[in-house]
Amino acid sequence: MRLTDSEWKIVNCLWKKPMTLMELTRALYAKTGWSKQTIITLLNRMVEKGIVTFVQEGRTKWFSAAIDRTEAELEETTSFLDKVYGGNVGLLISNLKCSDKLTKEQLEELKRIIEED
């Protein structure tokens, strides 16, 4: 399941720990300027889509991510790679290297990962 940019912002918070609506609002307001109502709307949609779940304790809802982080990241990466580079990993890495976006340490790490079995 592909996530929207807004869904990524919320689920990244929830992968760290379960949060209440007020905690999410505080965590996201500085970065996004979203109101409590905007976050409620997004959370309701995410619950319907199975991205987020919640447990009600009295009047408080505790929201948690319902999807696996690694699977979501892999799906997003694969989609980006296919859409932008036609699935060509070499072209992606070549473009990153040419744009000076990779540090020497990152290049060494990439080399180590490629050489692993």
Model-identified regions with their sequence ranges:
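Short capping segments at the starts of secondary-structure elements
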Residues: 16-20
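Amphipathic alpha-helical dimerization/coiled-coil segments
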Residues: 75-115
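Short, hydrophobic-biased segments on the C-terminal half of alpha helices
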Residues: 40-44
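Short, cationic-aromatic polyanion-contact patches
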Residues: 3-6, 57-76
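Glycine-centered, phosphate/nucleic-acid-interacting loop/turn motifs that mediate DNA/RNA or nucleotide
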Residues: 50
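Pre-recognition alpha-helix immediately N-terminal to the DNA-recognition helix
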Residues: 5-12, 91
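A short acidic, leucine-rich amphipathic alpha-helix
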Residues: 23-28
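Short beta-strand "wing" residues that participate in macromolecule-binding interfaces
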Residues: 54
